[in-house]
Amino acid sequence: MTRIAAIPTTPYANSERVLPGYQFADAFKVPAPRGITAMEAMRLAFAHRPLWIRTLMALRNQLGRLVGLTPAPAGGFPVVRESPDEVVLGFDDKHLDFRVVVALAGGFATLTTIVRWHNAWGSAYLAAIMPFHRAIAARMLEGVA
């Protein structure tokens, strides 16, 4: 089976509406199967996380507890809102707020991450996880293709 690689793309056009005052956004896209909904795409993206992603998320949760961060929910991030073409996930924490948007348009599924930090700790946290974030976001989206 040929693996479809997620490619970087322009972040979601309505990022400001999703998370007003955001300071960071990035996005990846893959071809979307015909007839798929955004919720189905989101489930595919989050369903088959390889061991290395599960390990990194578990490590993040363990280290995060030491500094008072909210652990990532075992069942996935809460859905903020959904439509057939868009699902917004995420939550607010003391160091930063984030949203993940899975959107369908033009035959592609796009995963955009949007972040607004509250303090220096939030900015530093984002900088520290950035290399892992990019690899994880791209790999998860590849599960849709």
Task: Walk through the language-model features, giving the residues of each.
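Hydrophobic ligand-binding cavity/cleft-lining segments
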Residues: 1-66
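Terminal "cap-and-tail" regions of soluble proteins that handle hydrophobic small molecules
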Residues: 2, 121-127, 142-145
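Short, solvent-exposed loop/turn segments at secondary-structure junctions
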Residues: 35, 94-96, 115-116
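A short acidic/glycine-rich loop-to-helix N-cap element
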Residues: 115-135
